[in-house]
Amino acid sequence: MYEQLLTGARELQAQTVAMRREIHQEPELGLDLPQTRATVLDGLSGLDVEVHQSQATTGLVAILRGARPGPNILLRGDMDALPMSEDTGLPYASQAPGRMHACGHDAHTAMLASAAHLLSEHAQDISGNVLFMFQPGEEGYGGAKIMLDEGVLEAGEKPDAVFALHVHPGLPSGVIGCRSGPILAAADTVHG
């Protein structure tokens, strides 16, 4: 199955890059990301996932039900931009003065949507459920806590494990750095 997933990921690469660039051009700040959420919803359309939209934020959770009982895995991606101007000259540079995706959240969002595509094609091989959490307000707004306090995950199953990622310019393309437990900065306390 590993080779199938790798092949599928390669086939989704152009779609992932296109979504990332679309989000990059129209960055939104904080908890109110209507255009970003619309792009994500469009990207999830046609997939066999249950979509639960946050009412307190523009976040959402898409739930993929596996074919057999098993663990519930949450994959999380942040969606918000930063209040700074972009001066990169890129053809897909920010069109919003004073806002840009300088931290990679546009990539995180596109990769998470593509992961939903890829895994939904293999739902018959999955034991348990996969929850895809698209979170606004990571940059100082406490978006994850707001979504959790709202009960957005109660529509699915309590996650047995949570995974997130962050692009890192210090690593070469195609290289993944990982470790067990918390890493990088956090606005909340991690209990475990």
Residue map of PLM features:
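Acidic/His- and Gly-rich active-site-bordering loop/insert found
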Residues: 2-101, 110-126
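Histidine/acidic-residue-rich, glycine-tolerant segments that coordinate divalent metal ions
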Residues: 60-61, 82, 89-100, 107, ...
